[in-house]
Amino acid sequence: MPSRFILSLGLGAALLGFAGQDALAANIVVDPANLDGWGFAEDNSGTAGAGSFVTGPATAPLGTGSAQLSVGDSASGEVLFNYNSAYTGLALNSITALSYSTYVDSNGDPDLAPALDFNVDPNAATSTYDGRLIFEPYYTGSSGSPIVQNQWQTWDAFGATTGGWWFSNNTVFANCTQANPCTWAQVMAFYPDPVTN
C-alpha cells in the first residue's frame, strides 16, 4: 500500500515571506494552471513516487486544495520543488517565519511527514552545492513522534523547541546531524551565513 502525504498549498506562500526580499515578499497561490516555478519530481533511486494537486483531504488549512505526495516503496521519494532563480543566494538568516501544514493518512508511516529541504552553501563566497538543510517534523517530538495521522498539522519550522533541523553533508556542516538535530536558533548560532543554491 503506498504511503501518502498531503502538503498544504500554503507551503508556497510560507516560503515566500522573507524579510529584506521585496520581490519575494508577496503571497503566491499555486494551482495546476499556475505553478509559478513549482513542480513535482522523484527524489530518490526508486520510481514509485507521484505528486498531484487534490481537493482536501478534509478541510485544508489554506483553501480547498493541497499537494499530494505518494511513495510506493522505501526506495522512492517524491518532492514538490521550486527552482526559481530568485531564491539562489538567499541568506537563510533573512527568513523571518517558516511554517507549513501536512496530512499523513493512515496508510502512511506514522513517523514520517513531508520535510523541508534547502540546497545550501555555508556562505555566499562560494556557489557550490554543499548538501541540504532539512527540517523534519519527526525530530520535533520530545518523546516519540509528534505526527498524528488523519488530521492536518501545522509545523512552525522556526519555533520548534526540540531538534527538527539537520544537514545532509556532515563534512561541511559538522553540527546539526540527523543523529543530533538542532533547533533553528542552534543552526543560526553554528552557521550564521548559509545561503541557498
Regions found by a protein language model. Give the residues of each.
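Short, threonine-centered small-residue motifs that mark membrane-proximal processing/anchoring sites
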Residues: 1-15, 19-26
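Extracellular ligand-binding interfaces
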Residues: 103-189
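Extracellular carbohydrate-recognition regions
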Residues: 26-49
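Short carbohydrate-recognition loop motifs
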Residues: 53-80
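Short, surface-exposed loop/turn motifs at beta-strand boundaries within globular domains
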Residues: 62, 93-95, 111
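Secreted extracellular polysaccharide-interacting domains
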Residues: 70-97, 129-137
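Noncatalytic modules at the cell exterior or secretory-pathway interfaces
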Residues: 192-197
